[in-house]
């Protein structure tokens, strides 16, 4: 069975689950998972884990994301993007200056909190928020803490005098769990007008960039040629943030049976409860070990291979 991470280009019009289902058919395996939902109207990078790589989905999900897109000022919708029904309109009679836009984006940068939109997959009391929304219900949603590393204009905004709307073009780097739709709405609030996210493309996720992605057409061609495995990145691509420790033969005999390794064997200076190391044997990533300060040693966190 093939194991690895497929840097898929998700086209618009498909859900992330649609993509997983199609990859299962193409690669003829049920062991497939994606690393972070993209809305149907969003395209871009969607890393897909195949085979044993499904064990690293959580690490890909935890990685930061980068997007480019646009925010249109002057109206709001139920879904915070162009798919919803219009619920508010306020003419932008005079376009905001570049400095005003920059200042609004700056207010959204750093450690901030968000309230997930009603049209989202977040669960409250066991139900998806979008299920409440489709029933016409609004429920209290828990705040989430996120980090916006960068939020900038990528080109000059445009103004449509006929509709009295203004469109801002941006790039954003953010932590997991960020709703860019909600960022767009909040930018409008800072500027004093309703707003929607009018376009979005994911540029980076899980260490993969847009120019590294492959399309379904390319995948199908490789499947026909018998070379589909060549499209898969190794599992350790998802774990590049963790320091590597190369094991001796003796250490590997212990580790493959789930034994601990000492603080000295972990080779890290002043490890703490957040310290993890990736253990490598014969150039193959075998597992992740986490440090236990109370025991002053490393214990298994995730095993990838034992042979």
From Swiss-Prot:
A GO biological process of this protein is: tRNA pseudouridine synthesis
EC supergroup of this enzyme? isomerase
Report the catalytic activity.
uridine(55) in tRNA = pseudouridine(55) in tRNA
Q: Which Gene3D superfamilies match?
A: Pseudouridine synthase
Q: Which InterPro entries match?
A: PsdUridine_synth_cat_dom_sf (IPR020103), PsdUridine_synth_N (IPR002501), tRNA_psdUridine_synth_TruB (IPR014780), TruB_C (IPR032819)
The family database entries (CDD domains) matched by this protein are listed as: PseudoU_synth_EcTruB
Q: List the Gene Ontology MF annotations in alphabetical order.
A: RNA binding; tRNA pseudouridine(55) synthase activity
**UniProt keyword Isomerase present:** yes
Keywords in UniProt for this one? Isomerase, tRNA processing
As recorded in UniProt, its EC number(s) are 5.4.99.25
Q: Keyword Glycosyltransferase, does the record have it?
A: no
Q: Which residues form the active site?
A: 39
The record's PANTHER family line, in alphabetical order, gives: PSEUDOURIDYLATE SYNTHASE TRUB1, TRNA-PSEUDOURIDINE SYNTHASE
Protein role: Responsible for synthesis of pseudouridine from uracil-55 in the psi GC loop of transfer RNAs.
* Family to which this protein belongs: Belongs to the pseudouridine synthase TruB family. Type 1 subfamily.
What name does the UniProt record give this protein?
A: tRNA pseudouridine synthase B
* Organism per entry: Lactiplantibacillus plantarum (strain ATCC BAA-793 / NCIMB 8826 / WCFS1) (Lactobacillus plantarum)
């Amino acid at each position: 069975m093939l194991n690895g991470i497929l840097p898929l280009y998700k086209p618009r019009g498909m859900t992330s689950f649609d993509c997983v289902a199609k990859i299962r058919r193409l690669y003829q395996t049920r062991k497939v998972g994606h690393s972070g939902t993209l809305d149907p109207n969003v395209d871009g990078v969607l890393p897909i884990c195949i085979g044993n790589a499904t064990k690293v989905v959580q690490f890909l999900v935890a990685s930061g994301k980068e997007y480019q897109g646009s925010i249109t000022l002057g109206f709001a919708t139920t879904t915070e993007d162009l798919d919803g029904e219009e619920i508010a309109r306020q003419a932008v009679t005079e376009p905001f200056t570049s400095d005003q836009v920059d200042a609004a984006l700056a207010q959204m940068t750093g450690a901030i909190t968000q309230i997930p939109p009603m049209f989202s997959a977040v669960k409250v009391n066991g139900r998806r928020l979008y299920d409440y929304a489709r029933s016409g219900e609004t429920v209290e949603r828990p705040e989430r803490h996120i980090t916006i590393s960068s939020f900038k204009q990528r080109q000059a905004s445009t103004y449509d005098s006929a509709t009295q709307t203004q469109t801002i073009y941006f790039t954003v780097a953010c932590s997991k769990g960020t709703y860019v739709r909600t960022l767009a709405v909040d930018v409008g609030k800072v500027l004093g007008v309703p707003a929607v996210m009018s376009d979005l493309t994911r540029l980076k996720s899980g260490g993969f960039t847009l120019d590294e992605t492959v399309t379904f057409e390319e995948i199908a061609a490789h499947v026909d040629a018998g070379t589909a495995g060549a499209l898969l990145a190794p599992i350790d691509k998802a774990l590049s943030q963790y320091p590597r420790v190369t094991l001796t033969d003796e250490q590997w005999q212990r580790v493959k049976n789930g034994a601990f390794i000492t603080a000295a064997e972990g080779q890290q200076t002043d490890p703490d409860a957040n310290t993890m190391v990736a253990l490598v044997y014969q150039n193959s990533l075998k597992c992740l070990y986490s440090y236990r300060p109370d025991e002053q040693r490393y214990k298994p966190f995730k095993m990838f291979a034992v042979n």
